[in-house]
């Protein structure tokens, strides 16, 4: 999500850091900033909300002493805690103005740490989780067993933090030193000649060096102009072979921005394990599901007697999946509406209605107007959004942010999986408030969600045959997608992706409707992709869809079946079988969607189209 750069060496750090931030603009951001260690033992911090040009204007006004120091940090922020404002932009510094930090990720236990610091008299200058880290390091550096030892102070604080994070610190009292660390979120080191770099990715330093190290899990590094020392969070540097990865960068800058992938969309598909994991982070605290911005009490949620979900495009498909989960867990009736239709049909809304509005950008015009219509009718409105501080969350009663990070590809991929995850969290929050799930049941469902990132990664690791399959069907005039239950919205999403990216005719159908018309389309060599339900979830649905597969195969179609590992009953009827791990019924879309994303992208590539920028489409639709 956020872009991080750190530099220590012989060159003026300001110029190096600002150039690095420009190279990392592709990551997306809502604010940016720099911390510069001056030659006179002081620290200068400059930060601005909005475009990087705003920061460049501010930096141009800095005194000459701030422009000549040779140690500095830079940051582009994608907001998670606190709105995208100047005061919440990074870097953050301690009260003495000596120590600065930049941060990517989430500190899950920040609320308790902040309370502890405030009890000690520390005053906070922002609404972020990040600021607790710099105040804790400042305390450790000035008092106690690590006093005067910058690196040891950082390590002592790291051991207290929960969550997924990358943290990079600079200290005006030790101007030639940077201390950085990572847990789960990426961090790479660039090894130069008399200079060292650290960044979120190699774009931070690729013009300066091609020699790099990827830090391992729960590792820290101390950087000086002369070299580096890597340790675990306990300070041990005897880490053994393979603890971190040394590599040479062969990519050019354009490839580095895409992480070595040909297109941003392919990179974003690969980022889906992190998108799901980050969306879950911090939402289960003391045995309860919590939202990011909760202005609805449990009593107000108990008063809800019906739910509407409003969204457009891919977000609408995630809303269809929300219906299955919310109805199953809460026994509340749920209607899913296209936002563009919702306010024009005079839906029945009142104070007992909860409207869930899903939007990646938070600016989707149809969804925004649906939110305003719901508010006019006194309904309660909850937003699921990927962009902190955008318009839709500002107008809602509660917010749950998907933390998928910036999505450059126009066709949504990682935000779709993050939206499904967020929808399920909303369902569990409602069940918890209404008492339709016992606390241990809510906890069990949450932990099942927590296991999904690893399973998503497993699917991604075995997906190559899908790309090869796409080559065979790249020139097909049409492709049909079939599913039942939660497989039906997945079929709709698969068809949409193929239409968006490959400009092919594709349709998704509920398999039970096959005999009511779509079977007339079946002919020789027509590719039909089937999302098979788990035989353990519903034996009846499984048997019925198996019957559908036999019907279409008997009419000459080519069957491409996505089924759970070990489902041998489907094998005789699948011309091509794509296997995914076995999970509970509601969680299957988080896995079965991935082959369809890869299939659509691969077909588009085979047809010679730009996967990132499909024709006639925009990432954020801000007009009706």
UniProtKB/Swiss-Prot annotation:
One of its GO terms (cellular component) is cytosol. The lineage of its organism: Bacteria, Bacillati, Actinomycetota, Actinomycetes, Mycobacteriales. SUPFAM superfamilies: N-terminal nucleophile aminohydrolases (Ntn hydrolases), SIS domain. It comes from Mycolicibacterium paratuberculosis (strain ATCC BAA-968 / K-10) (Mycobacterium paratuberculosis). The active site is at 2 (nucleophile), 619 (for fru-6p isomerization activity). One of its GO terms (biological process) is carbohydrate metabolic process. NCBIfam families: glmS (TIGR01135), PRK00331.1 (NF001484). Residues 297-436, 469-614 form the SIS domain. InterPro entries: GATase_2_dom (IPR017932), GFAT (IPR005855), GFAT_N (IPR047084), GlmS/AgaS_SIS (IPR035466), GlmS/FrlB_SIS (IPR035490), Ntn_hydrolases_N (IPR029055), SIS_dom (IPR001347), SIS_dom_sf (IPR046348). It catalyses: D-fructose 6-phosphate + L-glutamine = D-glucosamine 6-phosphate + L-glutamate. This is Glutamine--fructose-6-phosphate aminotransferase [isomerizing]. One of its GO terms (molecular function) is glutamine-fructose-6-phosphate transaminase (isomerizing) activity.
């Amino acid at each position: 999500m956020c872009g991080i750069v750190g530099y220590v060496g012989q060159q003026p750090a300001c110029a190096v850091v600002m150039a690095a931030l420009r190279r990392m603009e592709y990551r997306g951001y809502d604010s940016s900033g720099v911390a510069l260690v001056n030659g006179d033992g002081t620290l200068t911090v400059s930060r601005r909300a909005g475009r990087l040009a705003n920061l460049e204007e501010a930096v141009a006004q800095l005194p000459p002493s701030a422009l000549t120091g040779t140690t500095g940090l830079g940051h582009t922020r994608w907001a998670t805690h606190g709105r995208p404002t100047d005061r919440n932009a990074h870097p953050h510094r301690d009260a003495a103005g000596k120590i600065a930090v930049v941060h990517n990720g989430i500190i899950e236990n920040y609320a308790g740490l902040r309370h502890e610091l405030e009890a000690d008299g520390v005053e906070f200058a922002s609404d972020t989780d990040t600021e607790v880290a710099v105040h804790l390091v400042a305390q450790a550096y000035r008092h106690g067993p690590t006093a005067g030892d910058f690196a040891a102070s950082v390590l002592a604080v790291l051991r207290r933090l929960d969550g997924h994070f990358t943290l990079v610190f600079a200290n005006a009292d030790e101007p030639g030193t940077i201390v950085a660390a990572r847990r789960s979120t990426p961090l790479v080191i660039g090894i130069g000649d008399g200079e060292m770099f650290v960044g979120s990715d190699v774009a931070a330093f690729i013009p300066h060096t091609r020699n790099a190290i990827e830090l391992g899990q729960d590792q820290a590094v101390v950087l000086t102009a002369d070299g580096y020392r890597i340790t675990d969070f306990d300070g041990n540097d005897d880490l053994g072979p393979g603890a971190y990865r040394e590599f040479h960068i062969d990519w050019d800058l354009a490839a580095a921005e895409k992480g070595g992938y040909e297109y941003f969309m392919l990179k974003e598909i690969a980022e889906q394990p992190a998108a799901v994991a980050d969306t879950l982070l911090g939402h289960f605290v003391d045995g309860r599901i919590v939202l990011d911005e909760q202005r609805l009490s449990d009593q107000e949620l108990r008063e809800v007697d019906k739910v509407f979900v409003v969204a457009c495009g891919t977000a609408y498909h995630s809303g269809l999946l929300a219906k299955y989960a919310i109805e199953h867990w809460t026994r509340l009736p749920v209607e899913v509406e296209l936002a563009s239709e919702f306010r024009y049909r005079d839906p029945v809304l009142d104070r007992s209605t909860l409207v869930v509005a899903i939007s990646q950008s938070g600016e989707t015009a149809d969804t925004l107007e649906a939110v305003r219509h719901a508010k006019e009718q006194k309904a309660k409105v909850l937003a699921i959004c990927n962009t902190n501080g955008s318009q839709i969350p500002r107008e809602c009663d509660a917010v749950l942010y998907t933390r998928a990070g910036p999505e450059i590809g126009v066709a949504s991929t990682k935000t779709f999986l993050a939206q499904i995850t967020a929808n399920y969290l909303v369902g569990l929050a409602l069940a918890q408030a209404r008492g339709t799930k016992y606390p241990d049941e809510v906890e069990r469902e949450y932990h099942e969600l927590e296991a999904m990132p690893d399973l998503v990664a497993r699917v991604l690791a075995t997906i190559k045959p899908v790309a090869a399959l796409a080559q065979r069907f790249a020139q097909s005039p049409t492709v049909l997608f079939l599913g039942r239950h939660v497989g039906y919205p997945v079929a709709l999403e698969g068809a949409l992706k193929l239409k968006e990216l490959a400009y092919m005719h594709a349709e998704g159908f509920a398999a039970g409707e096959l005999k009511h018309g779509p079977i007339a389309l079946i002919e020789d060599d027509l590719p039909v992709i089937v999302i098979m339900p788990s035989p353990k979830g519903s034996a009846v649905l499984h048997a019925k869809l198996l019957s559908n597969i036999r019907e279409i195969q008997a009419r000459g179609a080519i069957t491409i079946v996505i089924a759970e590992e070990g489902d041998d009953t489907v094998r005789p009827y699948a011309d091509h079988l794509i296997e995914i791990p076995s999970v509970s019924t509601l969680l299957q879309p988080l896995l079965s969607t991935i082959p369809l994303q890869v299939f659509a992208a691969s077909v588009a590539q085979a047809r010679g189209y730009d996967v990132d920028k499909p024709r006639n489409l925009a990432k954020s639709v801000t007009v009706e």
